[in-house]
Structures are given as C-alpha cells and as structure tokens.
Amino acid sequence: MASIKRHKFKLSSEQLLEMLYWLKLIRSFDERLSILVRQGRVRSGVYSGIGQEAIVVGTCYGLRTDDYICPLHRDLGTFLIKGVSAGVMMAQMYAKATGLSKGRDSALHSGVPELGIFGNTSMLGANTPVAAGLALTFKLEQRDNVVLAYFGEGASNTGDVHEAMNFAGVHKLPLVFICENNIYSFSMPIEKSMAIEDVADRAEGYGFDGAAINGNDVLAVYQATQGAIARARATAVRCCS
C-alpha cells in the first residue's frame, strides 16, 4: 500500500487547546442529544458519532471556510467545527424554524454553502460523487480549494464510492476521501464484506495514495489529513497553471 508522507504540521499550545475544546464540545453535544432521543424529546433519526470525534476534529481542523466537506450521517461534529453554532444545530435536531432547514428536516440533510458544507444524503456513499463534482468545479475554476468526502467502510463497497474514486484519480481532483472504519456496517463485520485488511489498500488502484490511521489519535489524523490536503492543493495549482 502506498502511504501518505508524514508531514509535521506544527500546532501551538493554543491550537492544541482549541482541538481539545472541539473534541469535548462534539462529545458533549452527542451525549446530550442521545439523552434527548431516549426521552422522546428529539424524534429525528439520530446516528451517534461517539468515539469518532477525533476523525472529525483531525480532518476538519485547519480547513478554510471555502473548502468543502461532504459529511457522513454520523458527522454532526463537522457542522460545529465548520462554524455552525451548537444552538442552531440543536434547533435543527428539534426541527425548529431556527434550524438550518427552517423546520423542514430534523437530520443532517441541510447544507451550509457559505461555510463549505454540503448536506448529507440518506444513501450511504452517495455523497462521494457529489464531492467529486465539487472538486472538478474547483479545478475548472482554477481555485486551490479542496473537498473532503466522508464515508464508512460499508459504503466503500458501493458503486458510488468506486466511481467517485476512479473519477478523482483519473482527473487528479483536489479531493480527499475520509473512510471512517468502525468495523461494522450495520451488523456486517468488515472481514465478511472485503478481502483486504484496510480500505486504504484500494487507493493505489485508483492512482492516489492512501494511509490507515488510528482514528482515535486526533494528532495522527490531523497530520495525515494536512499532508493529503497540501498535496491536493498543489495538484490543483499544477493542473491550473
């Protein structure tokens, strides 16, 4: 498996504390939301991201406002770290008029274009072709922005994800794929859905690098993501020049 070079992107003490703040906020929000669901006060379909906060923070921290994310259904924290307030997000989960979708939806289907957030789709993996389209737009418009596309290891077996990765590799798009491997896809263990050890092993076949990172190590996730983003921006600039 080709591996992404380990870049040392230095973080100040203040930045490390800020990352800790995001980790704690996202976990606390998720825990509170889970309680509200059990109490019957929030009736929307809520998919907990507890235990995956380091992936959200490590990948989103340091993104520019005009960089786009296409989050997974468990990635509520990406909305927070990208700039949506906790109050607005809670209003969204309550389907209130003050939420992102003005009461029309109580999940994460609403996007926030001005913050670089494309709303989640109900079909797992279907966000990746959209991400490829966004990345192609950035390339054609000669912008050095990047797109982050999130999906699970189960969705990695779908045609949508395969086509998006193949398209991104062929056209050298400024797109970073983030696979959140939590071992189980619904009730299906990973060893019964793929013959390889890591989803990242597939990257070489699409013509780009991949790396398997400890998703609970926020600094390792940050370093790997920043390295991938730096190369994606450089690729976009080279293609435009």
What are these regions (language model features)?
Residues 21-37:
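N-terminal glycine-rich anion-binding loops that anchor highly charged ligand groups
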